[in-house]
């Protein structure tokens, strides 16, 4: 680019006019704003939301305390403590997820051999304090119990792709 061309581009502000023309084209188009609490957008079937722990049909929790989810978690958001029962099976005594650390990658769900930990379609949860986003085993089991039908349906729909 020669010095004269550069002078005319900067003197007549051609870049600025191109930007204003682009802005003007989008000014009168239809807006894509969604009024969130009243209007909902469609959620992907593979959306990863709030975590839940599942139980078997007989009421026993699925988690066998293999700690694969704790090992695979890149954010180190999962803490598990376990003990051996009288029948030589391991079960968790503590299963905590810190949602302030969690990046919702889904590795915990993928690594679980018994489909104990799942990520639900729930996206509307909050906490007033930092401690409200620290989910214990009992809280995760309560979420799983409450939404078991939805979780099972989502797992069945996603089964052909896994």
From Swiss-Prot:
Domain of life per record: Bacteria
One Pfam family linked to the record: Fer4_7
Residues noted as binding [4Fe-4S] cluster 2 in the record, renumbered to the chain: 73, 102, 105, 108
Intracellular or extracellular location(s): Cell inner membrane
PROSITE patterns: 4FE4S_FER_1, 4FE4S_FER_2
Residue ranges constituting the 4Fe-4S ferredoxin-type domain according to the UniProt record: 54-83, 93-122
The reaction(s) this protein catalyses: a quinone + NADH + 5 H(+)(in) = a quinol + NAD(+) + 4 H(+)(out)
Binding, [4Fe-4S] cluster 1: 63, 66, 69, 112
Keywords (A to Z) from UniProt: 4Fe-4S, Cell inner membrane, Cell membrane, Iron, Iron-sulfur, Membrane, Metal-binding, NAD, Quinone, Repeat, Translocase, Ubiquinone
Cofactor: how bound: Binds 2 [4Fe-4S] clusters per subunit.
Enzyme Commission code: 7.1.1.-
GO molecular function: 4 iron, 4 sulfur cluster binding; iron ion binding; NADH:ubiquinone reductase (non-electrogenic) activity; quinone binding
An annotated GO BP: aerobic respiration
Gene3D superfamilies on file: 3.30.70.3270
Lipid bilayer topology: Peripheral membrane protein
Function: NDH-1 shuttles electrons from NADH, via FMN and iron-sulfur (Fe-S) centers, to quinones in the respiratory chain. The immediate electron acceptor for the enzyme in this species is believed to be ubiquinone. Couples the redox reaction to proton translocation (for every two electrons transferred, four hydrogen ions are translocated across the cytoplasmic membrane), and thus conserves the redox energy in a proton gradient.
Family: Belongs to the complex I 23 kDa subunit family.
HAMAP family: NDH1_NuoI
Subunit (UniProt): NDH-1 is composed of 14 different subunits. Subunits NuoA, H, J, K, L, M, N constitute the membrane sector of the complex.
Protein name in UniProt: NADH-quinone oxidoreductase subunit I
Organism annotation: Burkholderia vietnamiensis (strain G4 / LMG 22486)
């Amino acid at each position: 680019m020669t010095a004269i061309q550069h002078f005319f581009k900067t003197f007549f502000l051609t870049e600025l006019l191109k930007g204003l023309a682009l802005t003007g084209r989008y000014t009168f188009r239809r807006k894509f704003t969604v009024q969130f609490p009243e209007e909902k957008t469609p959620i992907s079937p593979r959306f990863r939301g709030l975590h839940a722990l599942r139980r078997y049909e007989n009421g026993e929790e699925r988690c066998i305390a293999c700690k694969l989810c704790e090992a695979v978690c890149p954010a180190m958001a999962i803490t598990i403590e376990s003990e051996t029962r009288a029948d030589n099976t391991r079960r968790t005594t503590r299963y905590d997820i810190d949602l302030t650390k969690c990046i919702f990658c889904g590795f915990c769900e993928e690594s679980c051999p018994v489909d104990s930990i799942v990520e639900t379609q729930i996206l509307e949860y909050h906490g007033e304090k930092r401690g409200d986003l620290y989910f214990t085993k009992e809280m995760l089991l309560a979420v799983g119990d409450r939404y078991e039908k939805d979780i099972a349906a989502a797992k069945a729909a996603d089964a052909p792709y896994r």
